[in-house]
From Swiss-Prot:
The lineage of its organism: Bacteria, Pseudomonadati, Pseudomonadota, Gammaproteobacteria, Enterobacterales. Catalyzes the thiamine diphosphate-dependent decarboxylation of 2-oxoglutarate and the subsequent addition of the resulting succinic semialdehyde-thiamine pyrophosphate anion to isochorismate to yield 2-succinyl-5-enolpyruvyl-6-hydroxy-3-cyclohexene-1-carboxylate (SEPHCHC). Belongs to the TPP enzyme family. MenD subfamily. Its EC number is 2.2.1.9. It holds the Pfam family TPP_enzyme_M_2. It is an enzyme of class 2 (transferase). SUPFAM superfamilies: Thiamin diphosphate-binding fold (THDP-binding). InterPro entries: MenaQ_synth_MenD, MenD_middle, THDP-binding, Thiamin_PyroP_enz_TPP-bd_dom, TPP_enzyme_TPP-bd. Homodimer. Binds 1 thiamine pyrophosphate per subunit. This is 2-succinyl-5-enolpyruvyl-6-hydroxy-3-cyclohexene-1-carboxylate synthase. It comes from Salmonella choleraesuis (strain SC-B67).
């Protein structure tokens, strides 16, 4: 009997089972213990293969692929700390709903807790963060293939959102020629190999329950809060809110077109808050809200009813309002709860939104971070997509820009970390083959610098704008101790990214004014390659501009 041959047949069943659940992208890191899984994936023509030498980046690459494809994405890594490096992406997927299938190779049980090399306690190591966890036994012909395939099917059928961790122990030898070992075991699955359906088909329907009193509530004074959603959903939500005559507070990830722009500015005005207090119901569609003033208002508003609608399970309301938590796809929920044409009830808020927008426009000529956030709409590629980083940049875009309705926008706003942002953006581009604009800060770029290797393989123009304000300038917005701010919070690195781009053979520009930026972008959008554009800006100007605008708008 050949152990290596049977390992591969066992792995082939696992990988083939994944194809029956929509898995097309497989992300693979190098490793020896994962050889059975890697070879099974490599030999399966149903898969598109992606490779990366860094498991943390690999997990985020898969996250980006899943965001756009809306299908589960598989990740294959070897044993040991390689597995632990998947933790950040797994956590993010659990909070934002992307389906990741983490296939982690492992040592067999007799090599755990005995000093064996690269052997750690992997089973259950991710605690409660995966939505589903499956610890497979060591491959053996004593276990029928139908058990293995039905176990995979069951786990995937139960996976509504988030990650499935499948721990896969393999004994040595891991290498060797294929022979007939396990062939009969594998063939007992019969014509399943030629079929395209799961061995075990389980139905888990997610249906939106119609709220019987909706016809009552839609006649009241309401507010619509739009969080993270798809581009198609964003356009529908904008039309729905307009028909109802309810003000729409749109997050940067809502893709609603933010009909009342600069919400994070005018929500700091007492007149706006007073008018919103008249709302009898708040309907929040989507989660992961960005704006600080929006979150502050959400925490203090007290409507008669607060409804949260999202495809992801859980409360999703840090303010713990009295109301309803409805698990449903946003588009399906809107269809069941049609709007009734009514006149807008808010008067002050549209006026304040227009005045806030005018204040922002008045400062657009200065070459700086806040102005880039405002201008970002002008730089979006046609028929393309936008990936927004975390920390200060996403807050500036949320507060100062107005993105087109239905234009695809992606970000990692679940745990809102700055790790893996370049890798996620690379996955977003690969899944769509669209021209992509990504914008991150300098520390975010440094954190995921080796992901520039992924940008050597793009299928359409990709522009990475690195806003270099020399450190974590978001802390300039917080009451951090002045004497300790630079060393312990901002941590300026005093670096530039030209050598990093050159190391990975990427195009690079460092414009010093808007004309040079626009010229660099024009050239980049004509080339199916990646371009790094570094904007070196005054370190505190972005944060100070935001604070100045907040003060101005609060007194309108």
């Amino acid at each position: 009997m050949s152990v290596s041959a049977f390992n591969r047949r066992w792995a082939a069943v696992i990988l083939e089972a994944l194809t029956r659940h929509g898995v097309r992208h497989v992300c693979i890191a190098p490793g020896s213990r994962s050889t059975p899984l890697t070879l099974a994936a490599a030999e399966n023509p149903a898969f598109i293969h992606h490779t990366h030498f860094d498991e943390r980046g690999l997990g985020h690459l898969a996250l980006g692929l899943a965001k756009v494809s809306q299908q589960p994405v598989a990740v294959i890594v070897t044993s040991g700390t390689a597995v632990a490096n998947l933790y950040p992406a797994l956590i993010e997927a659990g909070l934002t709903g992307e389906k990741l299938i983490l296939l982690t190779a492992d040592r067999p049980p007799e090599l755990i807790d005995c000093g064996a090399n690269q052997a750690i306690r992997q089973a259950g190591m991710f605690a409660s963060h995966p939505s589903q966890t499956l610890s497979l036994p060591r491959p053996t012909q004593d276990i029928p293939a139908r058990w293995l395939v039905s176990t995979i099917d069951n786990a995937l059928a139960m996976l509504h959102a988030g990650a499935l961790h499948i721990n896969c122990p393999f004994a040595e030898p891991l290498y060797g020629d294929m022979n007939d070992t396990g062939l009969v075991w594998q063939q007992r699955l019969g014509d399943w190999w030629q079929d395209e359906k799961p061995w075990l088909r389980e139905a888990r329907r997610l249906e939106s329950d119609k709220q019987r009193d909706w016809f009552f509530w839609r006649q009241k004074r309401g507010v619509v809060v739009a969080g993270r959603m798809s581009a198609e959903e964003g356009k529908k939500v904008a039309q729905w809110a307009q028909t109802l005559g309810w003000p729409l507070i749109g997050d940067v990830l809502s893709q609603t077109g933010q009909p009342l722009p600069c919400a994070d500015l005018w929500l700091g005005n007492a007149k706006a808050v007073t008018e919103l207090q008249q709302a009898q119901i708040v309907v929040q569609l989507g989660s992961s809200l960005t704006g600080k003033r929006l979150l502050q208002w959400q925490a203090t508003c007290e409507p008669e009813e607060y409804w949260v609608i999202d495809n992801i399970e859980g409360r999703l309301d840090p303010a713990h309002h009295r109301g309803r938590r409805l698990v449903a796809k946003i588009a399906d929920w809107l269809e069941l709860h049609p709007a009734e044409k009514r006149k807008p009830w808010c008067v002050e808020i549209p006026r304040l939104a227009e005045l806030a927008w005018q204040r922002v426009v008045a400062q657009r000529d200065t070459f700086g971070e806040a102005q880039l956030a405002h201008r970002i709409r002008d730089y979006l590629p046609e028929q393309g997509q936008l990936f927004v980083g975390n920390s200060l940049v996403v807050r500036l875009i949320d507060a100062l820009s107005q993105l087109p309705a239905g234009y695809p926008v992606y970000s990692n706003r679940g745990a809102s970390g700055i790790d893996g942002l370049l890798s996620t953006a690379a996955g977003v581009q690969r899944a769509s083959a669209k021209s992509t604009l990504a914008i991150v800060g300098d520390l975010s770029a440094l954190y995921d610098l080796n992901a520039l290797a992924l940008l050597r393989q793009v299928s359409a123009p990709f522009v990475l704008i690195v806003v270099n304000n020399n450190g974590g300038q978001i802390f300039s917005l917080l009451p951090t101790p002045q004497s300790k701010r630079e060393r312990f919070y901002l941590m300026p690195q005093n670096v530039h990214f030209d050598h990093a781009a050159a190391m990975f053979n990427l195009r690079y520009h460092r414009p010093e004014n808007w004309e040079e930026l626009e010229s660099a972008l024009a050239g980049a959008w004509r080339t199916p390659a990646a371009t790094v554009i570094e904007l070196v800006v005054n370190d505190t100007d972005g944060a100070q501009t935001l604070q100045q605008l907040l003060a101005q708008v609060s007194h309108l």
